[in-house]
């Protein structure tokens, strides 16, 4: 008897289209989710509900939380490395992303950030999942820094039964005179 397939996943994220020209080819080589349809992004909450658990009321609850957050500018200023080996671009300021994550996690306490694996929320845009990204590729990314960005929306993305990711719902952040 074969083992059952792992449950499908979902995630809430802030897409960062301004970073795509700089990081896309590197993410395609070193971040497996990039080839599965996940754009350059900063995670708000992962893992979230399985796709079949996402109801209209859950989507409305996410929208009610996010509607209180204004869009905001940020910079991707430097490459950093997690101890586990992933390389990422750090956003400045990081606080608005932490605030988004904490507000969603407070509303959905059964889905802690990163499944509760980490004590702190460290906003990041992953460029490589493994520590073996070549130094010349990282230097190429660094030449484009800082990257000016604006967080305008959050996306609820879901995985399908083939492992590909699709945007299910887009949530606009409130318009802001600052952004």
Q: What residue ranges belong to the model's regions?
A:
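Basic, often amphipathic N-terminal segments
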Residues: 1-73, 81, 94-153, 167-179
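Active-site donor-binding loop signature of nucleotide-sugar glycosyltransferases
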Residues: 91, 159, 173
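Short beta-strand segments and strand-loop junctions that repeat across beta-rich extracellular domains
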Residues: 152-162
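Flexible glycine/acidic-rich beta-alpha junction loops that bind and position SAM and/or redox cofactors
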Residues: 80-84, 159
